[in-house]
């Protein structure tokens, strides 16, 4: 029992710097329009307008290996909960012929032990955990990401 308590205390002590740095990092990433200094707690700041979804049904190229595909259509009112998954009305194995939608990956039918199931694995059931619709949102911060093809094409310059 004492060993467990000591182990838990050491684990918490080791994790504390990470937790604290996460708080400060989140604080530093706050939008610039948040008022600084004293302000009424009831002050409401309007939210930025939502980015427009790109719904042209064009399949987007992936930027890195194993990137989940983007959703090329609107899903605003799709019900995805324990009772219903609207995505499955088109993307389930049984429905793809009629809908012409791509079937979900066979990996979605495997449980955590790699066993193939007859239906979608519960851990893959909530599509929007990984798959997101594409929007015309502008980046909040600069992005220097380059995919492997652009790095290889750039030669030494891309190998930084």
Swiss-Prot record:
GO biological process, one term: anaerobic respiration
Keywords annotated in UniProt: Electron transport, Heme, Iron, Metal-binding, Periplasm, Signal, Transport
InterPro entries in the cross-refs: Multihaem_cyt_sf, NapB
Presence of keyword Lipid biosynthesis: no
PTM info: Binds 2 heme C groups per subunit.
GO CC annotations, alphabetized: periplasmic space
UniProt GO MF annotations: metal ion binding
Cellular localisation: Periplasm
Subunit structure comment from the entry: Component of the periplasmic nitrate reductase NapAB complex composed of NapA and NapB.
UniProt keyword Glycoprotein, yes or no: no
Family recorded in the similarity comment: Belongs to the NapB family.
First-listed, main subcellular location of the protein, grouped into a coarse class: periplasm
Protein name: Periplasmic nitrate reductase, electron transfer subunit
TM annotation in the entry: none
Superkingdom of source: Bacteria
Residues engaged in binding heme c 2: 108, 127, 130-131
Organism: Azospirillum brasilense
Pfam families assigned: NapB
Function: Electron transfer subunit of the periplasmic nitrate reductase complex NapAB. Receives electrons from the membrane-anchored tetraheme c-type NapC protein and transfers these to NapA subunit, thus allowing electron flow between membrane and periplasm. Essential for periplasmic nitrate reduction with nitrate as the terminal electron acceptor.
Signal peptide per UniProt: 1-25
Intrachain disulfide bonds: none
Gene that this polypeptide is encoded by: napB
Binding sites annotated in the UniProt record for heme c 1: 73, 87, 90-91
């Amino acid at each position: 029992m004492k060993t467990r308590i000591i182990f838990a205390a050491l684990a918490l002590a080791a994790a504390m710097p990470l937790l604290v740095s996460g708080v400060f990092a989140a604080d530093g990433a706050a939008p610039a329009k948040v008022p600084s200094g004293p302000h009424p707690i009831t002050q409401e700041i309007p939210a930025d307008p939502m980015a427009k979804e790109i719904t042209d049904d064009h399949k987007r190229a992936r930027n890195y290996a194993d990137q989940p595909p983007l959703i090329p259509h609107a899903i605003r009112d799709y019900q995805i909960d324990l009772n219903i998954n609207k995505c499955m009305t088109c993307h389930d194995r049984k429905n793809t012929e009629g809908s012409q939608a791509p079937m979900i990956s066979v990996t979605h039918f495997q449980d955590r032990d790699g066993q193939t199931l007859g239906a979608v694995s519960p851990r893959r059931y909530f599509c929007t955990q990984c798959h997101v619709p594409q929007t015309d949102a502008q980046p909040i911060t600069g992005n220097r990401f380059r995919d492997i093809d652009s790095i290889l094409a750039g030669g030494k310059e891309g190998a930084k």
